[in-house]
Swiss-Prot record:
Component of the acetyl coenzyme A carboxylase (ACC) complex. First, biotin carboxylase catalyzes the carboxylation of biotin on its carrier protein (BCCP) and then the CO(2) group is transferred by the carboxyltransferase to acetyl-CoA to form malonyl-CoA. This is Acetyl-coenzyme A carboxylase carboxyl transferase subunit alpha. Residues 1-248 form the CoA carboxyltransferase C-terminal domain. It comes from the Bacteria. GO terms for molecular function: acetyl-CoA carboxylase activity; ATP binding; carboxyl- or carbamoyltransferase activity. It catalyses: N(6)-carboxybiotinyl-L-lysyl-[protein] + acetyl-CoA = N(6)-biotinyl-L-lysyl-[protein] + malonyl-CoA. Acetyl-CoA carboxylase is a heterohexamer composed of biotin carboxyl carrier protein (AccB), biotin carboxylase (AccC) and two subunits each of ACCase subunit alpha (AccA) and ACCase subunit beta (AccD). Keywords: ATP-binding, Cytoplasm, Fatty acid biosynthesis, Fatty acid metabolism, Lipid biosynthesis, Lipid metabolism, Nucleotide-binding, Transferase. The keyword Repeat does not apply. Its EC number is 2.1.3.15. Its main location: cytoplasm. The gene is accA. Pfam families: ACCA.
Length: 272
């Protein structure tokens, strides 16, 4: 085994800290590193252009794809520009516009997800935040093109799920995926936000936990200590995962693909 990828044991809370690390590679980094000839598209054709979600067309190993990412940015000015990775409804509508375009032109879709959730501001609610997320869930469940989603950092709440109704769902080894943050879990269930470490363990939010529940399809190994320790290596492993999955999905009948995708999500949580 490559010494950079030697297994180390981390607690669920340590995975949260790694997932939130300020130097963790962003979705934008993976787009720039893994794909060629990326052309970004803007706007939802209704209200505006949400910078928390970037998307466009690109190629990977001579396969034309649509690529979309919820991204937080990598410095203070980027954090503000990207709204700390919390999309507004126009972001989700932009993503859906690009996905419908991908369906029309028979391009597979690759989604990178890193968000603490959809933006909960008054303006977002007035512009239909819940409806935008619900519409994405509905449309993605029947979209006639292969979809691959990767949780690269945080994947929390419906804001993450809105880009994760996919044929293949992967998590980076130290990413997290949950209905809410450990802080929210501890505050709501125990009325004690100081119990975040306990909440992280109880909520089963790690890649290992979710693979055990068949919520995700695979775990993408990270370099020792996290993706931020060696972003280039991480991107190489992630690229291979994406290419292998694309080749597998492209061989499947579209109707079978849609049926499998729909049933995958209908069966989630059905453990008996």
């Amino acid at each position: 085994m490559d010494k950079d990828f030697m297994k180390i044991n981390v607690t669920p809370w340590e995975s949260v800290e790694i997932a939130r690390h300020k130097d963790r590679p962003s979705g934008q980094y993976y787009i720039e590193t893994i794909f060629k000839d990326f052309i970004e598209f803007h706007g939802d054709r209704n209200f505006g252009d949400d910078q928390a979600i970037i998307g466009g067309i690109a190629s990977i190993n001579d396969i034309n794809v649509t690529v979309i990412a919820i991204t937080k940015g990598s410095n203070t000015s980027e954090y503000i520009k990207r709204n700390f990775g919390m999309p507004n409804p126009e972001g989700y509508r932009k993503a859906l516009r690009l996905m419908k375009q991908a369906e029309k032109f028979k391009r597979p879709i690759i989604c990178f997800i890193d968000t603490m959730g959809a933006f909960p501001g008054m303006g977002a609610e007035e512009r239909g935040q819940g409806q935008a997320i619900a519409n994405n869930l509905f449309e993605l469940s029947r979209l006639k093109t292969p979809i691959i989603s990767i949780i690269t950092g945080e994947g929390e709440s419906g804001g993450a799920l809105a880009l994760a109704v996919a044929d293949k769902i992967f998590m980076l080894e130290h990413s997290i995926y949950s209905v809410l943050s450990p802080e929210g879990f501890a505050s709501i269930l125990w009325k004690d936000p100081s119990r975040v470490k306990e909440a992280a363990a109880v909520a089963k939010i790690t890649a290992k936990d979710l693979k055990g529940f068949d919520i995700i399809d695979g775990i993408v190994k990270e370099p020792r200590g996290g993706a931020h320790k060696n972003p280039v290596k991480t991107a190489e492993v992630l690229k291979k995962t994406i290419v292998d999955s694309l080749l597998e999905l492209k061989e499947k009948d579209l109707n079978e693909l849609i049926d499998n995708r729909y049933n995958k999500f209908r069966d989630m949580g059905n453990f008996y």
